Amino acid sequence: MAKIVNKYPVGIQTFEKIRKKGYLYIDKTQYIVDFREKQMSYVFLSRPRRFGKSLFASTLQAYFEGRKELFEGLAIADYEKDWVKHPVFHFDLSGAKHMGIEQLERYLADMLEEQETIWGYKTHQIDANLRLKDLVKRAYEQTGEKVVVIIDEYDAPLLDVVHEKENLLPLRRIMQNFYSPLKMLDPYLEFTFITGITKFSQLSIFSELNNLDNISMFDQYSAICGISKKELTTQMKPDVAALGEALGMTYEECLAELTRYYDGYHFSEKSEDIFNPFSLVKALNADKIAPYWFGSGTPSYLIKTLQKYHVNVMDIEKKSCDVDDFDVSPEMMTSALPLLYQSGYLTIKKYNPMLHRYTLEYPNREVKIGMLKSLAPNYLSPISLDNNSLVGDFLEKLYDADVEGAMVRLKAYLASISNRLSNKNERDFQTVFYLIFNLMGAYMKVEEDSAIGRADAVVYMPDAVFVFELKYDGSAEEAIRQIDEKGYLIPYTADGKRLFKIGANYDSTQRTISNWIIKEE
């Protein structure tokens, strides 16, 4: 049985429960200190789903409620002396997804009624904006303290219909109405914190709150949610060591595998390395490294976005966009890239300060393989993603150094899906091979680039390395010649493994591989 280091808060987003029940908590309260020292009044934070936004919102609620006992030993305990108890209204809109007009209005009404009951009065108002205004004023008058408003997942009611104008407009009007009092309530408000995934600029939150601080892409707040590399290798080092022991790995090997699967998020130009907290905590709790975040569901709005912009699976990686692209409201976007970034499927890998452009890539192996598996049925037979089908068969034969058998399997597979290819041209051919070899990366290391050139694919096995070069209506001889002339094998000659080079040709008339050459060095 694995060594138990900590209790992990799997699925727990309530600060009070985590602290009282002794679950692992990575201290983020220094960011609250920062808010207070800078006298920030309105703060907006965008982060992907399941990335810790709700836990931070819950932490803020406990702080402003003066729950001093929950913060013992944390950074803010040394800063805060007064622990003033403010009225806090915490509105969680994550439950307002997939709703029509009447459902959304009822949801808002129920939230407000719950707070009205707590404050002991029944309103005569019907409109949500007037009820919110009365609620804040009533709390201020009763306590003599300014009010804190926390709106978690503010955009949840809108994301699913972002590409459906006839459905988006009425829902947006409802939410615009609900948020509209915030500006006029300024004299009664101590602090307002809003979280979401993207920025709907036409909502009153952004158009009227001139002093709203959007901290989403500020370097100093890059680790406000998620778990930084520093936090993992200091506060959580025993947890990583215990997971490694359970998996038969050293600490260094386990850290490298966690990094490969869950690290890689960057939310600003000089961002810290951030790990996905949902997957990381799940892995530590289960003693198993697996695609937990991606497996928890791909939002329908993301699939619709990819379809709307006809995104090809090969076009997602290493794309550049301007700084201004991140400030575009989703219903006004002309590209899928900003929403892919905001949703956590792409992240910042490089920033060019002269051109003010970001290079976006997949953050890690979990997201890349998950995205490819989601998109692959558009190009491949769905059954090809099963362990017993192409990828599994191909890798098994390579493991046994049966390269001929692997190529025969690949040829038969390509012939079987030829009718699924949309244009049956070189672009389709490239896309299929891109998917096949990248999906192999779910099981082992697949490399495309080297310092001296680019092979189509390099597959690593425990005892062998396989370098593939693929031609379209060319020849296998031409492919082998390119491997030799470009020196694609050179980086692997010192590994002490068997080295195979495979040159293959795809015949567009046969719609499969027509011939190949296999050579072992």
Pin down the residues of each PLM region:
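Structural motif
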Residues: 148, 464-466, 500
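Mg2+/Mn2+-dependent nuclease catalytic core
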Residues: 169-173, 472-489
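Domain-level recognition of nuclease-like catalytic cores that cleave nucleotide substrates
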Residues: 491, 497-521
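Metal-dependent nuclease catalytic cores in nucleic-acid-processing enzymes
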Residues: 178-185, 338-346, 434-439, 483-502
